[in-house]
Regions:
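N-terminal cationic and glycine-rich segments that engage phosphates or anionic surfaces
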Residues: 3-4
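Transmembrane signal-anchor/signal-peptide helices with a preference for the extracytoplasmic
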Residues: 8-12
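Conserved pre-motif I regulatory segment
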Residues: 14-139
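Conserved glycine(s) of the Walker
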Residues: 143
Length: 144
């Protein structure tokens, strides 16, 4: 208990490691307000294509006689690397998109649904944690 006061809890230390990534997301997010909707859609498509191409390039570079499980593991590793590479920009685009549609409503299954959310930093920290394959629990008790 005393050590936790000096060094912080494991959770505090883990969150502190994520703060530089959160800062990058928020810095990039700030630049997106000047982009058009079409710019964001185009960039999102480019990011998707990047991930797909990384998978394809890895699959094509592997020997055909390679064990199927090993082959799939290598392709998955390439895909994860691509997702890690685009994560900051993808999360910034999502945050900007949420800001733009905040206050909009849709009719879904006969019910009016109002979008009222732009992700808070703590939610982005949870998303970064989930992206890395770890379990995340919000202070509200909401776990993923």
């Amino acid at each position: 208990m005393i050590l936790a006061k000096f060094f912080g809890t494991k959770s505090d230390r883990e969150m502190k490691k994520l703060l530089p990534t959160l800062d990058k997301i928020n810095q990039l997010y700030e630049t997106f307000s000047s982009k058009t909707d079409e710019d964001l859609v185009t960039r999102t498509q480019e990011l998707k294509e990047f991930v797909i191409n990384q998978r394809l390039e890895k699959a094509q570079s592997l020997h055909a006689d390679m064990d199927q499980q090993e082959r799939e593991a290598e392709i998955l590793k390439a895909e994860q690397g691509a997702l890690d590479f685009i994560m900051v920009e993808a999360f910034a685009i999502v945050k900007e998109t949420c800001r733009r549609i905040c206050g909009s409503s849709w009719r879904i299954s006969g019910q009016e649904t109002l979008w009222e959310m732009v992700p808070y930093d703590v939610q982005l920290l949870g998303a970064i944690t989930l992206h890395s394959g770890k379990v995340s629990e919000m202070k509200t008790g909401e776990g993923k």
